[in-house]
Swiss-Prot record:
Pfam families: DHHA1 (PF02272), tRNA-synt_2c (PF01411), tRNA_SAD (PF07973). InterPro entries: aa-tRNA-synth_II/BPL/LPL, Ala-tRNA-lgiase_IIc, Ala-tRNA-ligase_IIc_anticod-bd, Ala-tRNA-synth_IIc_core, Ala-tRNA-synth_IIc_N, Ala-tRNA_ligase, Ala_tRNA_ligase_euk/bac, DHHA1_dom. Catalyzes the attachment of alanine to tRNA(Ala) in a two-step reaction: alanine is first activated by ATP to form Ala-AMP and then transferred to the acceptor end of tRNA(Ala). Also edits incorrectly charged Ser-tRNA(Ala) and Gly-tRNA(Ala) via its editing domain. Binds 1 zinc ion per subunit. Gene3D superfamilies: 2.40.30.130, 3.10.310.40, 3.30.54.20, 6.10.250.550, Bira Bifunctional Protein, Domain 2 (3.30.930.10), Threonyl-trna Synthetase, Chain A, domain 2 (3.30.980.10). Its EC number is 6.1.1.7. This is Alanine--tRNA ligase. GO terms for cellular component: cytosol. It comes from Mycobacterium bovis (strain ATCC BAA-935 / AF2122/97). Keywords: Aminoacyl-tRNA synthetase, ATP-binding, Cytoplasm, Ligase, Metal-binding, Nucleotide-binding, Protein biosynthesis, RNA-binding, tRNA-binding, Zinc. The gene is alaS.
Length: 904
């Protein structure tokens, strides 16, 4: 049974049972605690916690999931995958344990003709949480499972959570007996290779707190209602139904392996474990990379971008270790598209962009490997010269960490040169790096806002945002927080409120102040008391959302006192809001213009909007041409001047997308969304920000620059409105000043400047020619006046004229060539206006035969001028910082030559 048929049967089974089919969410969600979506229930968390009312009592989905903590284990075993599909059914207070068990059993054991998977009931085992007697009884009643095929396990195995605070509960896992060839009998507690887990039924009934392990966390209490969250690994059930040994032999991953095998001309699964590991790494990581790029991730140096970069580099590295030097990533992306396209049509529709980004990373990494190879050769040569036979762990780590050079290639190349590698030292340094990374991640996690302080208010209901309709609202203070702790309710005049000079957080029941989100920074404004507390006034410096529902106002209390329960007036600074709306609406204009000029692959990757300024990041390979940049600016301003009406309305998510509304990769949207339309089809986006009422209010948009901020990601910055005018006025004044100084009309300034630059370069070139001619004449004179110390001819001379190290090397070559084949040494030191003193020494082969080495002599120079230097026996150089030591340095060289030449 093909995987697309397995998926269809799953969804059809639950839709027939009354479930609503919900599309997979992006693997990227707006959650600081979650790098990637790693479970099917993630998009339903607000329903489980009771934060939002689900629009359906039951649901089913097949969620894209990514887990990367065990990335180094991928390929070594066949059990680890970085990407997997989690088929699930969910109940939000509807059915519970009995319903979940009945539905799962029916799908697994019903015949193919009846829409099931047709598994043998006698080969199915289950595990349950150790004290869940109800689940044991239900498995016996519903499925007729004997007691010996129902095994009890502890919290680590059968009590499920996402690993972070949130919903949790006991679980029951379903296993399929693959037969004695895979391991001993005795059920899952004996062998999870023979007894393969295919489905996990989680009886979601509690909420957990912070914890460091699967068992070390506090149960905070019951959820508002009992829920069901199940997860069936599509790849797992596929290997059972396709009767293959592991997921890499299924129709999802085997095509990628076959593509690699054709290029490598090496067979897979013929007893070469190391090659098989590489095949599996390529298959797994290629698929994950395609999904990540498809969901809007670009290769980078941190966060999600770093994970993607690491995956692609492991693919390229593994291919090279299989003997593939040619580019292969493009072919891999095409194979993934063909295998996954029936289930994920976006991989087909967006293939050109996905492939372009992946291939660009391959090209960049190949350059890294080339430079790393050169560095390896230097390190290996240095190791051998020292007499060692082992490349240090430190060198291997530097190659890996700084230059991206894979340890496997280091090991292979070291073996080819007769060296070993201190793998233990390397692994220790890698482990230390991982420990630091985990500590940093833990610190970031715990630095995130402690939601428990706000839990009572979150549970009580959301803040009503009134800022789309008014800039001034009457509100009630629901809570006051200082340093993350709630201030007890007190009466006015009693210590415990928020008084003058304090910096506090105020939570209101309603507010017109926009909370930072969607790239738009928070509003500034004021919160003022009313009635008997009208003297109270606070300046709002920031507004943030807690749990996406609660507006937290960070304020400086300027006068009076605030107490929980007070009625206040929250007001937005009108000038601030006007500038913010100009910036945000301008961003939509620039986005639309970029897509019009570059095409639909110019996908938004981030933005920042503040009064008078916008910053827009988008996925694109390579810089914009001058013509493209001009077009973008022109299209943007034409749309602004067209005075388009800006219309906002709410719509169902699916309908909004069908209308052509742009939904940003990685964003999590509710079922009902806010749509912002500017000029009909010109710009249509899902957006929760504040905007102008017509595009003319944006004012002029001036693009300041366009640059790269990472692999495949570009950034446009622009001024809007009055800030744009001021920028243009400043540039106009600058141009007028240049025209006046150059005594030409403004339109002739560029040509005049170009002419001046050309003349300046010609003058500099002529000056350089004269300087070098003078230096060569000096070289000729120096060679003619060479000292003879014993049988060695020596030129030891200071050079004037501000010579550089490169100049000295050139002159040394000239002088040495004029001294003939007898033993000769040249030592030159440059003097000039700067304190830096460059120097160089050369010794010809005849001098080296006498034991004179340039790299030894350069050390004599270095001591006298307080510098450093190095090189080889024939040529060495360095620089110092003490010009007064030049004469002493040259004398030191003469003395050293005299000693070696044995002249008294």
């Amino acid at each position: 049974m093909q995987t697309h048929e397995i998926r269809k049967r799953f969804l059809d089974h639950f839709v027939k049972a009354g479930h609503t089919e919900v599309p997979s969410a992006s693997v990227i969600l707006d959650d600081p605690n979650l790098l990637f979506v790693n479970a099917g229930m993630v998009q339903f968390v607000p329903f489980f916690l009771g934060q939002r009312t689900p629009p359906y009592p039951t649901a089913t989905s097949i969620q894209k999931c990514i887990r990367t903590p065990d990335i180094d284990e991928v390929g070594i075993t066949t059990r680890h995958n970085t990407f997997f599909q989690m088929a699930g059914n969910f109940s939000f207070g509807d059915y519970f344990k009995r319903g979940a068990i009945e539905l799962a059993w029916a799908l697994l054991t019903n015949s193919l003709a009846a829409g099931g998977y047709g598994l043998d009931p006698e080969r199915i085992w289950t595990t349950v949480y150790f004290d869940d007697d109800e689940a044991v009884r239900l498995w016996q009643e519903v499925a007729g499972l004997p007691a010996e095929r129902i095994q009890r396990r502890g919290m680590a195995d059968n009590y499920w959570s996402m690993g972070i605070p949130g919903p949790c509960g006991p679980s029951s896992e379903i296993y399929y007996d693959r037969g004695p060839e895979f391991g001993p009998a005795g059920g899952p507690i004996v062998s999870e290779d023979r007894y393969l887990e295919v489905w996990n039924l989680v009886f979601m009934q509690n909420e957990r707190g912070e914890g460091t392990t699967k068992e070390d966390y506090q149960i905070l209490g019951p959820l508002p209602r009992n829920n069901i969250d199940t997860g069936m690994g599509v790849e797992r059930i596929a290997l059972v139904l396709q009767d293959v040994h592991n997921v890499y032999e299924t129709d999802l991953l085997r095509p990628v392996i076959d593509t690699v095998a054709r290029v490598a001309a090496r067979a897979y699964d013929v007893g070469n474990h190391e090659d098989d590991v590489r095949y599996r790494i390529i298959a797994d990581h290629s698929r994950t990379a395609a999904i990540l790029i498809g969901d809007g991730v670009s290769p980078g140096n941190d966060g999600r971008g770093y994970v993607l970069r690491r995956l692609l580099r492991r693919v390229i590295r593994s291919a090279k270790l299989l003997g593939i030097d040619a580019a292969i990533v493009g072919d891999l992306m095409a194979t993934v598209r063909n295998a996954m396209g029936p289930s994920y049509p976006e991989l087909v529709a967006d293939f050109e962009r996905i492939s372009r980004i992946a291939v660009a990373e391959e090209t960049a990494f190949n350059r890294t490997l080339a430079s790393g190879s050169r560095l390896f050769e230097e390190v290996a040569s240095s190791t051998k010269k020292s007499g060692a036979t082992v490349l240090s762990g430190s060198d291997a780590f530097t190659l890996h960490d700084t230059y991206g050079f894979p340890i496997e290639l280091t090991l292979e190349m070291a073996a080819e040169t007769g060296l070993q590698v201190d793998e233990i030292g390397f692994r220790e340094l890698m482990a230390e790096q991982r420990r630091r990374a985990k500590a940093d991640a833990a610190a970031r996690k715990h630095a995130h806002a402690d939601l428990s302080a706000y839990r009572e208010l979150v549970d009580a209901g959301a803040t009503e945002f009134t800022g789309f309709d008014e800039l001034r609202s009457q509100a009630r203070i629901l809570g006051i927080f200082v340093d993350g702790k709630r201030v007890p309710v007190v009466a006015h005049g009693v210590a415990g409120g928020a008084g003058e000079g304090q910096r506090v957080e105020l939570v209101l029941d309603r507010t017109p102040l926009y909370a930072e989100s969607g790239g738009q920074i928070a509003d500034e404004g004021t919160i003022s008391g009313t009635g008997s507390s009208e003297a109270a006034r606070a300046a709002v410096t920031d507004v943030q959302k807690i749990a996406k529902t609660l507006w937290v106002h960070r304020v400086n209390v300027e006068s009076g006192e605030f107490v929980e329960g007070d009625t206040v007036i929250a007001a937005v600074d009108p000038g601030w809001r006007r500038g913010a709306t100009q910036g945000h609406s301008g961003t939509h204009m620039v986005h639309a213009a970029l897509r019009q000029v570059l095409g639909p692959n110019a996908v938004q990757a981030g933005s920042l909007n503040r009064p008078g300024y916008l910053r827009f990041d988008f996925n694109w390979q390579g810089p914009l041409t001058d013509d493209q940049r001009t077009q973008v600016e022109e299209v943007t301003n034409e749309a602004v001047q067209a005075d388009f009406e800006v219309r906002t309305f709410t719509e169902q998510l699916d309908k909004a997308k069908a209308m052509g509304a742009i939904a940003l990769f990685g964003e999590s949207y509710p079922d009902e969304v806010r749509v912002v339309e500017m000029g009909g089809p010109f710009s249509l986006e899902l957006c929760g920000g504040t905007h102008v009422s017509n595009t003319a209010q944006i004012g002029p948009v001036t693009i300041l620059g366009e640059s790269s901020i990472g692999s495949g990601v570009r950034r446009v910055e622009a001024y809007v409105g009055l800030d744009s005018f001021r920028h243009l006025a400043k540039e106009r004044a600058l141009m007028a000043g240049l025209a006046s100084s150059l005594k030409v009309p403004s339109e002739e300034v560029p040509a005049r400047v170009a002419n001046l630059v050309e003349r300046l370069r010609a003058a500099e070139k002529e000056l350089e020619r004269v300087r070098m001619a003078s230096a060569r004449a000096a070289a000729t004179n120096a060679a003619a006046g060479a000292q003879r110390i014993g049988n060695v001819r020596l030129v030891a001379q200071r050079m004037s004229g501000g010579m550089t190290a490169a100049d000295l090397r050139s002159l040394i070559g000239d002088i040495r060539g004029k001294l003939g084949s007898e033993p000769a040494v040249v030592a030159l030191i440059a003097e000039g206006e700067s304190q830096t003193v460059p120097y160089a020494v050369a010794a010809n082969p005849a001098a080296q035969d006498l034991g004179i080495r340039a790299n030894d002599l350069v050390k004599q120079l270095a001591v006298a001028v307080e510098g450093r230097g190095g090189g080889k026996a024939d040529l060495a150089q360095g620089s110092g910082k003490n010009p007064t030591g030049i004469d002493a340095a040259l004398d030191a060289v003469r003395s050293e030559i005299a000693v070696i030449a044995r002249v008294g």
